[in-house]
Amino acid sequence: MAKTLYNKLMDAHIIRENISTALIYIDRHLIHEVTSPQAFEGLSIANRKLWRKSTNLAVPDHNVPTTNRSSGVSSISDPISRIQIETLGRNCELFGIDEISMNDTRQGIVHIIGPEQGATFPGMSIVCGDSHTSTHGALGALAFGIGTSEVEHVLATNCLWQSKSKNFNIEVNGSLNQHVSAKDIALYIIGQLGTAGGMGFAIEFSGNTIQNLSIEGRMTLCNMAIEAGARIGMVAVDEKTINYVKDRPLAPSGIKWRKAVKYWRTLHSDKNAHFDKTMHFDAKDIKPQVTWGTSPDMVVATDGYVPNPNNAKNQTEKISWKNALNYMHLNANTKISDIKIDKIFIGSCTNSRIEDLRIAADILKDKKIANNIKLALVVPGSGIIKKQAEEEELDKIFINSGFEWREAGCSMCLAMNADKLEVGERCASTSNRNFEGRQGQGSFTHLVSPAIAASSAIAGYLSEVK
């Protein structure tokens, strides 16, 4: 019987099942400081041990400072942030879990360091107490976010009961327009599908446009599957995938590598596999994108206009658009290029990989950011990416243009650390969510690609690449 990639991965991990749910084995559990404290506390109260220590890998990322860390955790001024990072360290030591600590050169965002260290590879089931765990599906893995109670369950049993998802194939074919990236593909699809269009589905991204993306680009795409309502996003394994994983620290080696590769090459949807839903997109229809509202599906092309609520499809959407415009302090029919920006953020688990930094640096080379830009940040996704960028002298390009070059972390993606927007500030951000107050109370977020973030920094307004 022909199977989809999702069904192959699920079937390989099922321990027990009924019609709608299945008990599945978890191969890899990624841990950070925000969703794990209560889980570890639950284990301690129940006097439970870990089922399999080696399947866990921890890293602090949400609360870490991106400025000077020379004095370690004590340099964190916010007491809650400091306590969470200290608690993660103590719990990892107590339970014998490998932790990439804050001042380790490998430290970074959990969804960056997983693939980077080879902790993520094809065929795995991967969970983390974070909704953007779908990122890892780019490597042909079954990856999804879980809640704190489930974090405890995985620590204790390496198993989870999960509802079975339906299969959704999103196919994109054709050559991308100039300056269009995986981030633009993701935002465009979310704009067409809506933030609930993928609910209950595992999305497989396919088509020659997706095949031509780098692994970094595929990670960006799968990262944002959750913004379309799907907990799972994935791409079939190909030679790019295998070459990406090869020789990474935690990847298989020797005879295990050869056996793994043989299996990995089967991780694709079979020719006649049944999908419950299918959508087709032509790459030539996708322009650089920017969000204008308070949801990732409130998105238009950068050469477009803020939409008019009177043109909404229904009354619910009309009200939603009106509320978004009111919050964002924008007027309908405003030209996108007339929206003035205060700050720029290039980073997050969506767009902080070396490919993203190269794209932005190429646009910023020999240019300066606009005078009205109060702050422009580049925050690499990991210490390894930071080191590579510095070896390529990308940091000098950013600094010379007026950007600040920071240490790795989640940074301004969310207002949980020192990097946040002030009330009334507007940011062009390469992150993944533009909810009310996401980057700081009363702040305004416009989601963009690294290319558009860089060009907007130069223009001082939301801007296409000139």
UniProtKB/Swiss-Prot annotation:
[4Fe-4S] cluster binds at C349, C410, C413. It catalyses: (2R,3S)-3-isopropylmalate = (2S)-2-isopropylmalate. GO terms for molecular function: 3-isopropylmalate dehydratase activity; 4 iron, 4 sulfur cluster binding; metal ion binding. PROSITE patterns: ACONITASE_1, ACONITASE_2. One of its GO terms (biological process) is L-leucine biosynthetic process. Belongs to the aconitase/IPM isomerase family. LeuC type 1 subfamily. Heterodimer of LeuC and LeuD. This is 3-isopropylmalate dehydratase large subunit. It comes from Vesicomyosocius okutanii subsp. Calyptogena okutanii (strain HA).
